[in-house]
Amino acid sequence: MNKDNLIQNYAVALFNNALLDNIQVTIFEEITLLNRIIEDSFDIKEFLISPIVNKIDKINVINSLIKNTKLNKIVNNFLLLLIKNSRTHILSNIVEAYNKLLYESRNIKIVQVISSNQLQPREQEWIQYRIEKELQQKTALFFDIDNTIIGGIVIKYDNVLRDYSIKGSLEKIAKCLKNVKVC
């Protein structure tokens, strides 16, 4: 099984468990917090992904840490399952896939907007308005900065890429010029 399918399977299983109790958002918040704690602590991360540390030791340490928290039982069991199956290294990917499932369940499309510099709030609102009007669907926009696009924006959602950047335009012009023959 490839890594993407594995990640998706874990995310779907977690989402379906949360759906049974109608606590999808709570579970998302808790696994996001848990992931942030693991990612921010080099020692915890290394401990959890280390093949040298016995799984039983990992489970005992996590159980003692979890005992003092108010994490949902679903999240506790999920983390223990990841440890048991040596999958803690894909937790951040699972959180991302779970987030997508959460948006999809609310009929919200995730859209990534890349610009060469930070966009002003009014620009972000205008872009969101235009995209929602075109897609006829609510969107959740995530803005990233990539100064290599020189100017303009690049919009990504599903398998669609809309390149309105200067870099993209220059590449299209260069491609066309390669096909031009000078007599």
Swiss-Prot record:
SUPFAM superfamilies: N-terminal domain of the delta subunit of the F1F0-ATP synthase. F-type ATPases have 2 components, F(1) - the catalytic core - and F(0) - the membrane proton channel. F(1) has five subunits: alpha(3), beta(3), gamma(1), delta(1), epsilon(1). F(0) has three main subunits: a(1), b(2) and c(10-14). The alpha and beta chains form an alternating ring which encloses part of the gamma chain. F(1) is attached to F(0) by a central stalk formed by the gamma and epsilon chains, while a peripheral stalk is formed by the delta and b chains. Transmembrane segments: none annotated. Its main location: membrane. It is a peripheral membrane protein. Gene3D superfamilies: N-terminal domain of the delta subunit of the F1F0-ATP synthase. It is found in: Cell inner membrane. F(1)F(0) ATP synthase produces ATP from ADP in the presence of a proton or sodium gradient. F-type ATPases consist of two structural domains, F(1) containing the extramembraneous catalytic core and F(0) containing the membrane proton channel, linked together by a central stalk and a peripheral stalk. During catalysis, ATP synthesis in the catalytic domain of F(1) is coupled via a rotary mechanism of the central stalk subunits to proton translocation. InterPro entries: ATP_synth_OSCP/delta_N_sf, ATPase_OSCP/dsu. GO terms for molecular function: proton-transporting ATP synthase activity, rotational mechanism. GO terms for cellular component: plasma membrane; proton-transporting ATP synthase complex. NCBIfam families: ATP_synt_delta. This is ATP synthase subunit delta. It comes from Rickettsia typhi (strain ATCC VR-144 / Wilmington). Belongs to the ATPase delta chain family. Keywords: ATP synthesis, Cell inner membrane, Cell membrane, CF(1), Hydrogen ion transport, Ion transport, Membrane, Transport. PANTHER family: ATP SYNTHASE DELTA CHAIN (PTHR11910). The keyword ATP-binding does not apply.
